[in-house]
């Protein structure tokens, strides 16, 4: 709480909106773990800033310490299936590439050529990624965007980012990972 970046001046309600933002009026969905949650910033993350600065509405489904891989009821997949309204109208689905999968040594898996949900091995990182992409695309019919974490010195996470960029070309999604290369 006493971190300088958590000062009142930086709270979303104290940030000026962007005039004529192309995001104005959009409804965004954020799925992730601690970064999306805002764990070190009083539960306020970039999602709140994007919404306030750009006159957006949003849904934020974020729980710290969780994984993409479907290994328990708090996984990204389970929370996406059970906590996000499948009838919602989203303009974009934005998902965090979790470092927790790398930290927990979740198997990377293989990229599939399928677009059938039942074909993905969701116990692996890549199977979970592909499941999330296909489910979001077929449920909300909106662009699917992934973002990577800050610099994280992990060979396993580096491989996850590399594979995400391969999936990006196959699945026609957007991955914001180039910043850290």
Where is each model-derived feature located?
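Membrane/wall-proximal cationic-aromatic binding patches
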Residues: 3-30
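Short, conserved loop/helix-junction motifs that constitute active-site signature segments
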Residues: 21-23, 87-88, 137-140
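Conserved SGNH/GDSL esterase-like catalytic core that processes O-acyl groups on lipids
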Residues: 24-29, 35-119
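Short hydrophobic segments within beta-strands
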Residues: 31-32, 147
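Alpha-helical structural signal in soluble globular domains
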Residues: 49-53, 135, 139, 160-168
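Cysteine protease catalytic core and zymogen-processing segment of caspase-like enzymes
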Residues: 117-129
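Generic structural signal for well-ordered alpha-helices
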Residues: 129-133, 158
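Extracellular serine-dependent O-acyl
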Residues: 143-148, 154-181
């Amino acid at each position: 709480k006493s971190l300088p970046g958590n000062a009142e001046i930086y709270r979303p309600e104290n940030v000026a909106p962007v005039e004529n933002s192309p995001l104005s009026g959009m409804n965004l969905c954020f799925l992730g773990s601690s970064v999306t949650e805002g764990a070190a910033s009083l539960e306020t993350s970039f999602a709140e800033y994007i919404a306030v600065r750009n006159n957006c509405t949003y849904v934020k489904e974020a729980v710290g310490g969780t994984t993409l891989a479907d290994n328990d009821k708090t996984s990204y997949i389970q929370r996406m299936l059970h906590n996000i309204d499948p009838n919602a109208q989203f303009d974009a689905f934005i998902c965090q590439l979790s470092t927790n999968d790398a930290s927990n040594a979740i198997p990377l898996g293989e990229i599939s050529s399928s677009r059938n949900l039942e074909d993905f091995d969701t116990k692996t990182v890549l199977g979970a990624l592909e499941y999330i992409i296909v489910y979001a695309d077929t449920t909300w019919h909106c662009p699917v965007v992934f973002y990577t974490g800050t610099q994280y010195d992990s060979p396993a996470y580096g491989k996850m980012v590399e594979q995400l960029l391969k999936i990006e070309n196959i699945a026609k999604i957007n991955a914001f990972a180039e910043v850290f290369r």
